[in-house]
Amino acid sequence: MRSSMSLGAAVVWLVVGAAAPDAAQYQVTETADEIRIVTPQLEAAVRKKGYVSGVAAQSMLDKKTGFRDPGFGLDIVDWIMEPGSDEAYRDQLHPELVYHAGNLYHGQRQKRSIEGPQICTQARQLDPKVIRGADFVAVTQQFQYRTAAPGRKTGSVWKQVLVFPVGRRYFVSMDKIETVNSSDAMFLRIDMPGHLRHQRGDTFSRIWLSYRGEIPASEFFSDFPPDARFDYLRGRDPLPERFIRAYQLRDPKTGKEGPWLAGMTLEPSVVSDAWCHQRGYVCFIEEFGGRPIKAGDSFSAAFIVGYFDSIDEMNQVFDQHRGHTRLEVSPQGWRLGK
């Protein structure tokens, strides 16, 4: 399929890690419920059943510091959506597809589901596959959407690639939609890097958004809607040089500060809307796409998610991989593409 978001007529590939260290020391175990990956830098799990997609909640261990992700998972996937209200046909929708605006959860911007269900909570079961290479381990998984709004087809396919490179405290990922529907502004909703659970800032000290700057934990002690503050909206806000969303972790028992847990969208222009608001937890919903697309086309975004010691380190890693929206993997290697 051709991409409706290509940045040029030709695809430009970046081949990664040709002379990287060996990944033979990676431990990969698989059960009926999950795939677990252990490297010298990280531990992480990918769930097959229950709450699925991305890296499982609190499974990603940074061995350098001993910290884990404090949320519901990393690079977690929801619905295919578009701007607009579903009010005219809401009584015909499966309840899981109904979208109510004008509240603390969704704010004032009208949006509606094209296809569902929400993958993370309703897919129930996926069949992830492991790919091992000389300098990485990867997991691929996909899901075919099975519900749709009136007048829309079911059957679009979500695909995800997660690559764990040798010697890194992060993974590289891609989410891709191969659509059976047309839309003026179709987007995929994900959690990036992932939601942040806390009690009055006990698990984090501050948030850093590359398009907003640093925000203290105290700003998230009370609930507020996503469009009240700290949100990003393409077209309203300047396009940032980098698109990075991160929080500095804190040990809830000792108060000791830990590493930054960051999610980077490697091509900033693909992001149409991004939230950072409090709703019992800090909600890091991100939406990418939001451009015209025809049935039979596809769109994707590429990410880096993991642990970093400083904002400078995050910026350096972003700059090494900037501009990419695709990720391909085989036993021979993995590569980011534009």
Spans of features found by a protein language model:
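Bacterial N-terminal signal peptides that target proteins for export
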Residues: 1-9
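Bacterial N-terminal signal peptides
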Residues: 8-17
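Boundary at the C-terminal end of the N-terminal hydrophobic targeting segment
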Residues: 18-24
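Beta-strand-rich recognition/accessory modules
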Residues: 26-38, 228-338
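Acidic, contiguous internal or C-terminal segments within carbohydrate-active enzymes
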Residues: 29, 48, 128-200
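Acidic-aromatic substrate-binding/catalytic surfaces of carbohydrate-active enzymes
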Residues: 32-146
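Broad, structure-driven detector of short, well-ordered beta-strand segments within folded domains
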Residues: 41-48, 156-164, 258-265
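Polysaccharide-binding surfaces and accessory modules of carbohydrate-active proteins
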Residues: 181-256
